[in-house]
């Protein structure tokens, strides 16, 4: 599947703000949409881009390379 540039845009804002919620606010969309988009990108690339916890997100080694 060809990954949309919008996926990378969402990834960029999540990585920049270290938060799905803050990225959603900046992108004026919902947090579930941001989460789903990142999940789709991770599935397309075949790797995890973020480690998630209740305090936010941290880039994985693969995420660092993409960022």
Predicted regions and their residues:
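The N-cap/first-turn positions of alpha helices
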Residues: 4-7, 31, 63
